Amino acid sequence: MPASSPDGILFRMRLLLCIAGMVLLLGGCATPDFNGVVLDPPDPAPALALTDSTGAEFALSGQRGKVVLVFFGYTHCPDICPTTLLDWKKVAAELGTEAESVRFVFVSVDPERDTPAVAQRYAARFDARFTGLSGSRDQIDAMLRQWKLAAFRDGIPGDTAPVYTVSHPSQVFVIDPEGQLRLMHRAGLTPAQISADIRALL
């Protein structure tokens, strides 16, 4: 069948339309490029069975429909904790009204010094919309096991000095509106990059 014949031209037009349809289909299924580490496949986020400053238990299940950022630290942290929350403050400002669909959660892993009220005051120093959580030592340890994370007091075992540092995770965990753990944000991302990831999940 000559390519210039009516049948040949019709065949080529059908082929081009088919290819165009496939391109549109694949484009519609494309996933956004993220700046954070993608957790694939995503898993349901572990529970945060901890207490807020009002004495109520904080439940991730109650945050459905929102993107939730979770960071584990402590209020006496000299470096990455204030840096992370300051970045969050900039992210919230950059998101504008979209920040209403985001929950920023600071979890203290130093319950000996950080009560829920102390954790909340610390988080609110950066932005009144931020949530600070803590709990008993048993609650914190159980939560860390669920998240498969570790945090421990630095120094000599048994040391009871009131001034100490705590080794803890440095990454931020990002949970999508369906409650799935989707991303990890490592140190070094800019507020603009963090905001872009949040917008891609909203």
Predicted regions and their residues:
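A short beta-strand-turn-helix
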Residues: 48-68, 92
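C-terminal motif of bacterial Sec signal peptides marking the signal peptidase cleavage site
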Residues: 26-28
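Bacterial N-terminal signal peptides that target proteins for export
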Residues: 4-17
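Thiol/disulfide oxidoreductase modules built on the thioredoxin-like
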Residues: 139-197
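Structural microenvironment flanking redox-active thiols in thiol-disulfide oxidoreductases
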Residues: 83-143
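Short active-site neighborhood of thiol/selenol oxidoreductases, capturing the structured segment around
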Residues: 61-84, 88
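Short loop/turn microsegments at loop-to-beta-strand junctions
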Residues: 45-46, 68, 169-170
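Bacterial signal peptide processing site
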Residues: 30-32
